Regions:
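Terminal, non-globular segments
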Residues: 1-172
Length: 172
C-alpha cells in the first residue's frame, strides 16, 4: 500500500515539475527568470529520512529512469543524480538527525547542488549556453526559493507516507 501511495505522489509531483516548466521563463524587470522547483527530487530526499533509504533508493531509480526517458536529452543524468543525492542525504542525516530546520537546510542545499550538477553536465556537453553567474542569479536561486515555498507541503506528504508505513507495520 505504501509503495502505491509513494508512486502516485511521485507521479503527481513529476507532473507538477513539468507543469512549472511551462510557466518559465517569466519576465521580471525586463529579465527572464526561470522558476523550476524540484518537487519530486525533494520528496525523494525526504523519503530517505521518513520511509527509509531502501525505499527512497528504489523510487530514485524508478523516477530517475522515467525522467531520463521522458526528457530524453541525456540519459542517466537524473538517475545518477537522484541516487548520489539520496546517498548523500542518508549520510548527512547521520550527523544532523531529524531537526526540522537542519533537514530543510540540507534538502534545499541538495536541491541547489542538484541544479548545479545538471548545469555542469549540460554545459560541459554544450547543451546549455548560459553563463555561470547568470545561471545562479536567474535560475538556481529563484528555483530554490520556489522550492522552499513548497517544502512544507512535501514535508507533510513525506510524514503522511511514513505514517502509512507505520500503520501497516502495526496492523501486520
Amino acid at each position: 500500500m505504501q509503495m502505491i501511495v509513494i508512486f502516485i505522489i511521485g507521479l503527481i509531483l513529476m507532473y507538477a515539475d513539468m507543469a512549472f516548466t511551462s510557466f518559465s521563463p517569466m519576465t521580471m524587470f525586463s529579465v527572464e527568470v526561470y522558476f523550476v522547483p524540484k518537487l519530486l527530487f525533494m520528496y525523494i530526499l525526504l523519503l530517505t529520512i521518513y520511509a527509509g533509504p531502501r525505499i527512497s533508493m528504489l523510487f530514485a531509480i524508478l523516477f530517475g529512469v522515467m525522467l531520463d526517458v521522458y526528457i530524453g536529452s541525456l540519459y542517466g543524468i537524473h538517475i545518477f543524480g537522484f541516487i548520489a543525492f539520496v546517498i548523500f542525504m542518508q549520510t548527512a542525516f547521520r550527523v544532523f538527525y531529524r531537526d526540522f530546520v537542519a533537514m530543510a537546510f540540507v534538502v534545499l542545499l541538495n536541491t541547489f547542488l542538484f541544479d548545479l550538477y545538471q548545469y555542469a553536465v549540460y554545459s560541459v556537453l554544450d547543451f546549455i549556453a548560459m553563463p555561470f553567474f547568470d545561471y545562479i542569479a536567474l535560475r538556481a536561486i529563484p528555483s530554490v526559493l520556489v522550492s522552499a515555498l513548497f517544502f512544507v507541503i512535501l514535508y507533510v506528504l513525506a510524514i503522511q507516507t511514513a505514517k502509512v508505513r507505520k500503520e501497516l507495520r502495526r496492523i501486520n
